[in-house]
Structures are given as structure tokens and as C-alpha cells.
Amino acid sequence: PLEIFTTRDGEVIFKKYSLIGGLEDFAAQFCDTLARSSEFTAVITDRDSVIATAGPDKRDLIGRPLTSEMEQLMDGRSIYQRSRGDAALPVCQGNDHLIAATAAPILCQGDVLGLVLFAAGEGQYPDESEYKLAQTVSSFLGKHMES
């Protein structure tokens, strides 16, 4: 879907509509809480880019477009948890040093709206707490978007 805007000069602007993008402030508060509960950078995305983040590498992620690997995780519709020996999955284009440690899709009425994920540098691996946090927050955001 597209949003259509007009400027004062009559110029028409088309912008891709992001359902979850309207929750940027709310998502930022969630990320702040998640980052305090973990040693990882907390990230919430829509289908195209990072909409909220908190933690050590926040400036390197906000607003950046997602990699094809993140798009594949969303298409898979299941929770991803990196283990030793797994290939590194960069979160954002042009930034290979931050990789997905745990990622959970945000599902709303059968559609994937984005991801809740924890990003880390090479050599950092998540545990069960990051898995459960990502799972819980993605489920909550999906339910919130349904109402």
C-alpha cells in the first residue's frame, strides 16, 4: 500500500505505507527495555528497514534498509537463533559487523509486519532469555496491531 501526500506547491509524494512504522515511539520504548535486559542491541523492523533500536550499536542501525537475509527470515515465519557454526546474517545493508543473534517475526492476521531481533558482533551468541524476549515482544506487537 502507498500513502499519498501533497506539498503546498501541489507536488504529489508517494510513500510506501508501513503498518508497524506508525508505532515508532512505542517500538523505541520496547527496544530500550529489551536492551536493558540483554547485552545485545535490540532492534524492531518493518518489512524494509529498522524503525527502532536501543543498545550499544544503535546509531549504526536506525533507518537502514534490511538485508536479503532478514527478508528471508521474515518469509520463513519462524524464530531464528544463531548457534556456533552458523553463518553470520547481517541485519542492515552496508553494515556487516552487526549480525542477527535472535530474530522473531511480527505476525498480524497471517501477515509478517517486521522483526523483533537482537543484534550482536561476531562471536556473541544468544541464550534462551533472548529467544523468549524476542518471541514475547513479537507476539505482543502482532496482537497489538490486530486491535
At which residue positions do the language-model features occur?
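Non-catalytic regulatory/interaction regions at protein termini and inter-domain linkers
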Residues: L2-F5, Q72, Q109
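Structured interaction and signal-relay segments at domain junctions
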Residues: I20-G22, Q29-N95
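Juxtadomain coupling helices with adjacent low-complexity linkers
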Residues: E24-T33, I62-Q72, Y80, A119-S147
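Short hydrophobic/glycine-rich mini-motifs in sensory/regulatory modules
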Residues: I106-V116
